[in-house]
Amino acid sequence: MSKVIKKRVETSPRPTASSDSLQTCAGVIEYAKSISKSNAKCIECVTLNASQYANCSSISIKLTDSLSSQMTSTFIMLEGETKLYKNKSKQDRSDGYFLKIKVTAASPMLYQLLEAVYGNITHKERIPNSLHSLSAETITEKTFKDESIFINKLNGAMVEYVSTGESSILRSIEGELESLSKRERQLAKAIITPVVFYRSGTETKITFALKKLIIDREVVANVIGLSGDSERVSMTENVEEDLVRNLGLVDIDDEYDEDSDKEKPIFNV
């Protein structure tokens, strides 16, 4: 087992937002814009349609003609501090795990999706009758929680382990959930797709499903070095020997009980 010590790299401050501002339609749109690296127009319009579930509306995205002609998908890429958690009370269910991403960068698709959805609600267009009573001014918006997006729809997703100068390793996430949940928080990219627009009274959010997680294949631990500084120590020797699965420190918050008094993701849809 190699232990290659890497000094922590200082990064520029990430955009921040107050909890109150992230719970307004205007606030969440502005925050999504602040973490977008581009303002290139991607979305022509969004339509919300009634579904078999009273509280859920399906989401139909129409991309701009130039993107549609290139057969571009409506997937959204995010980057941020990522951690996979267990739901202790749901180990026998498909949502026994969920992903928390503290987003530091996002595709412009994200803010344009939010902008289009709440623009529709404001103008009472391209929405089902069940949403006509909503006012964008009084909505409590829950897509972000603590500047993070929570994703519990993981079925069918892939995980790609990457390492500089070496071939990446692609696997189905189903076989990686246990080992990923034992990793510490680390920077990763995620490709997600919107699932439904969820409403409960005046609380709303867009829910997402994970399509792909792109993560450094090294398992690292944050330790306090001899000088008192925080250092990141590589704990992985060879992914092909499955050390990526079997090594890693269990984070203190590794298991998350939705029935406990802890804060939890809202709208498990």
Swiss-Prot record:
This protein's GO CC annotations:
host cell cytoplasm
Q: Which superkingdom heads the taxonomic lineage of this protein's source?
A: Viruses
Q: Which GO terms describe its biological process?
A: chromosome condensation
Q: Where in the cell is it found?
A: Host cytoplasm
| Keywords, alphabetical | DNA condensation, DNA-binding, Early protein, Host cytoplasm
What upregulates it? Expressed in the early phase of the viral replicative cycle.
Q: Does the keyword Endoplasmic reticulum apply?
A: no
One GO molecular-function entry: single-stranded DNA binding
Which Pfam families would you find in this protein's record? Pox_I3
Q: Which InterPro entries match?
A: Poxvirus_I3_ssDNA-bd
Main localization of the protein?
A: host cell
| Keyword DNA damage (UniProt) | no
What the record says about family reads:
Belongs to the orthopoxvirus OPG079 family.
Describe the subunit structure: Homoomultimer (Potential). Interacts with the small subunit of ribonucleotide reductase.
Q: What is known about what this protein does?
A: Plays an essential role in viral DNA replication. Binds to ssDNA with high affinity and localizes to cytoplasmic factories where nascent viral genomes accumulate. May disrupt loops, hairpins and other secondary structures present on ssDNA to reduce and eliminate pausing of viral DNA polymerase at specific sites during elongation.
Q: What is this protein called?
A: Protein OPG079
Organism of provenance: Monkeypox virus
